Amino acid sequence: MDDTSTLIDVKEYPDTEVQKNRVLTLEEWREKWVDGKIGFHQEQGHQLLKKHLDTFLKGENVLRVFFPLCGKAVEMKWFADRGHCVVGVEISELGIREFFTEQNLSYSEEPIMEIPGAKVFKSSSGNISLYCCNLFDLPRVNIGKFDRIWDRGALVAVNPGDRKCYTDIMLSLTRKGFRYLLAVLSYDPTKHPGPPFYVPDAEIKNLFGSTCNIHCLEKVDVFEERHKSWGIDYIVEKLYLLTEK
């Protein structure tokens, strides 16, 4: 890793009240999918995941990999193609169906009996299962434990007031020896209310520090023209590797 990649100077702001009280409903997230407002989706996959894939997988085979708030992340097929078992959770049924369609994967669907109105979509190959439900309802279903968690666009999308509950669920899903890759964003939260929400280093330490070793792998300037409409003039993505203490 290029040492300069972790030396980008990022100003840390205390978590602001405007974001602490911010709430997006599940229906608002569904509407984003219906309206095509999914700027968070990366058609070519996540570059930092590609770069640090060996660190994440650590040469192990047939891993169980969890994708919280998965959307139609193309990386799910990457892992499945490598022989890993992928499980995701997503509130938008449209997003899940688009994943299978765009990846040319046949699938089946069935109701989740423990969660009224929820469904699980499974690839015909059997190694991709996507749960269409509220992530916070997921503990009602026994989906097993995971060796790896890829958290990109998840912690930053969860309402700030729900972060502790979210983290508790994530850590409850980990197996011994897990590796948890977490991508968060830094920008001036006084200028943009989110989502994606600003997650400072102190918050990550507060959420994960008691149970995880926390290592920042890389910081990257990801500012694009579209971010100007947010009222900000910089945005930095930070990638953390969380491992068992």
Swiss-Prot record:
Pfam families: TPMT
Positions contributing to substrate binding: 40
Class of enzymatic activity (EC top level): transferase
Superkingdom, taxonomy of origin: Eukaryota
Catalytic activity field: S-adenosyl-L-methionine + a thiopurine = S-adenosyl-L-homocysteine + a thiopurine S-methylether
PANTHER family reported in the protein's UniProt record: THIOPURINE S-METHYLTRANSFERASE (PTHR10259:SF11)
Family according to the record: Belongs to the class I-like SAM-binding methyltransferase superfamily. TPMT family.
Protein known as: Thiopurine S-methyltransferase
Originating organism: Lynx rufus (Bobcat)
